[in-house]
């Protein structure tokens, strides 16, 4: 603030300068703005506490990750004074859903590209961190390298990526899309999704409008229920809407369900099928959900039948819809058993039928 005895001319010039700046001008520390300062930081950036405390024997780290039920190992190559690393750690790993998803699927080990700790690589070769980074061609920071259960590199992400693309990269590896398609193709499959704006969920007319009173514990409903747990800026959600949910046959099946769409991170009130009053966020947390979109199917009495918590396409989604509509779970107990024995030939019953 200017002191009171500052000259009127100087104060006027200052006010003109302030007014000349557009109100919507992005902050200089916003990495997505033209004014972002990418010079080395003045203060070092720290990696999250949940990163693995490692002796940098990478094969041992991978073995431990797989033993814990994870997809593989994620190496984070960074520097202490790297502004792009700071942006990734704060903007991407600073988001609750990204952190939860990453921790569920990967152990993350940090490599300082200027460090001197000894690293034992997947082949047993021992080098210092700095040389290891050179050998791995991690010349730009941050660089993320993913290793799968065969101890081979399956994907790398170089530089900073906004949360939307970063989530997509994690999903691309965790769901093993690298086995069948390039990351470019995986991203392109979401281009047909309908967005009202960047911060909204996708919309379809088969969703019931709020308030969501889903209680089925006192009175049996006439139709099964499917709840879509989603989140904003969700690449996998966009893929679902651009693909399976734009298919006429899929939509015909879905319109025979009661269908509800929830933002799994919102405080929107909801009454669950069991009659519990809660919020979308609290319900998703109680269900242990970490992936979006997750589709949970309930029968007419409010009992969960099954859930889809990974990327799903036409064949599988339509199969699950038929499985629930035909009440195949009553006879076969599981979707896979139903699929093997009846799913290929069993049509969904007419609306209201109860086989």
Residues of each region from the PLM?
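Alpha-helix initiation/capping motif
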Residues: 1-2, 19
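Bacterial N-terminal signal peptides that target proteins for export
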Residues: 2-11
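A fold-wide structural signal in alpha/beta-hydrolase
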Residues: 107-109, 258-260
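Intrinsic disorder/low-complexity signature
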Residues: 2, 26-27, 109
């Amino acid at each position: 603030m200017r002191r009171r005895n500052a000259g009127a001319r100087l104060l006027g010039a200052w006010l003109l300068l302030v007014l000349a700046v557009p109100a919507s001008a992005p902050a200089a520390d916003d990495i997505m703005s033209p004014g972002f300062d990418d010079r080395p930081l003045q203060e070092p950036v720290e990696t999250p506490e949940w990163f693995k405390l490692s002796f940098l024997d990478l094969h041992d780290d991978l073995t431990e990750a797989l033993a814990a039920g994870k997809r593989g190992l994620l190496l984070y190559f960074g520097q202490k004074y790297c502004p792009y690393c700071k942006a990734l750690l704060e903007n991407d790993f600073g988001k609750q859903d990204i952190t939860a998803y990453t921790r569920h699927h990967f152990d993350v080990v940090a490599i300082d590209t200027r460090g001197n700790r000894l690293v034992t690589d997947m082949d047993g070769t021992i080098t210092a961190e700095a040389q290891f980074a050179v050998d791995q061609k991690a010349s730009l920071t941050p660089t993320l390298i993913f290793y799968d259960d065969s101890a081979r590199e399956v994907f790398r992400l170089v530089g900073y990526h906004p949360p939307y693309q970063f989530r997509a990269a994690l999903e691309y590896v965790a769901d093993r899309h690298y086995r069948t398609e390039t990351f470019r193709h995986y991203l392109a499959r979401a281009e047909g999704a309908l967005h009202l704006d960047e911060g909204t969920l996708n919309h379809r007319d088969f969703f019931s409008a709020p308030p969501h009173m889903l209680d089925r514990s006192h009175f049996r409903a006439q139709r099964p229920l499917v709840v879509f747990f989603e989140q904003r800026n969700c690449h996998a959600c966009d893929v679902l809407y651009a693909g399976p949910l734009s298919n006429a046959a899929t939509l015909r099946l879905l319109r025979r369900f009661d269908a509800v769409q929830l933002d799994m991170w919102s405080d929107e009130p909801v009454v669950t099928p069991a009659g519990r009053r809660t919020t979308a966020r609290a319900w998703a947390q109680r269900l242990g959900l970490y992936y979006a979109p997750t589709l949970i199917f309930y029968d007419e009495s409010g009992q969960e039948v099954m859930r889809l918590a990974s990327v799903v396409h036409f064949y599988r989604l339509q199969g699950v819809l038929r499985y629930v509509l035909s009440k195949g779970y009553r006879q076969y107990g599981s979707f896979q058993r139903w699929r093997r024995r009846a799913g290929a030939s069993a049509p969904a019953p007419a609306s209201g039928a109860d086989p």
